[in-house]
């Protein structure tokens, strides 16, 4: 069933990707306003002459932010890369400090926007950020996470369930929620799944972290269906799948492996047996 759903999702995702200005990402539904932002939480503005996009990310090193590849895999009308700025550790986006500027980015070389494989990117900041960085898992650590645990998400995305892409808006105040972890599926080898009925990441939350016990296991990547919080788990890029790639890219390891292999374990997503599910990027663009 999931292979059939993936074919449908790929068809619709290809249509959506043709016009990135119309693409929206998720924000958190069913959460609460965070009292403060984790010091490593990043708000990202992706600017071209066509649009201004918004995503989230996490500070993984003093000058590196990790986010979803689909957030930054865009160009302007001349084919140039976007201008990206970041604000680190700020919960209230109505009171912004001077942003950090991204001077280069590295998108996973085998990123595929039609399947969302490799939906991970690293952004280099011009100036170091002297604050706490997020804790990353060891290689394939997600394979040992038991299904049913409660994981935490953060984001500035849509907060109302049942909202469609055209109706979505963002919030200026960081939201947080706990989501049930469901596990893996072989159709999405580099993703893990989490979500609940009435609680979900949604439009505007792309790139935001999924954490357990203070460790970031996921990057908000995509959702099924046209609206959020329907009870169908969302897809999160498995950070531990890319541990070796991150280490090598940042010079943390001497090996030159392209990426770590994915963990095992199938997930039975019974709720995915809906008549038609649309692969929904959790990314928002605004004029």
Feature names for model-found ranges:
Residues 5-14, 275-277:
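Bacterial N-terminal signal peptides
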Residues 267-286:
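A cross-kingdom C-terminal cell-surface attachment/processing module
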Residues 47-50, 70-77, 89-94, 126-131, ...:
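Acidic glycine-/aspartate-rich tracts in secreted/extracellular proteins
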Residues 21-48:
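N-terminal activation segment of mature serine protease catalytic domains
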Residues 34, 40-42, 54-73, 82-85, ...:
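C-terminal subregion of chymotrypsin/trypsin-like serine protease catalytic domains
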Residues 15-21:
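Sec/Tat signal peptide C-region and signal peptidase I cleavage site
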Residues 92, 105, 117-198, 239-240:
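Chymotrypsin/trypsin-fold serine protease catalytic domain
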Residues 44-45, 65-68, 72-110, 178:
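Conserved H-D interstitial segment of serine endopeptidase catalytic domains
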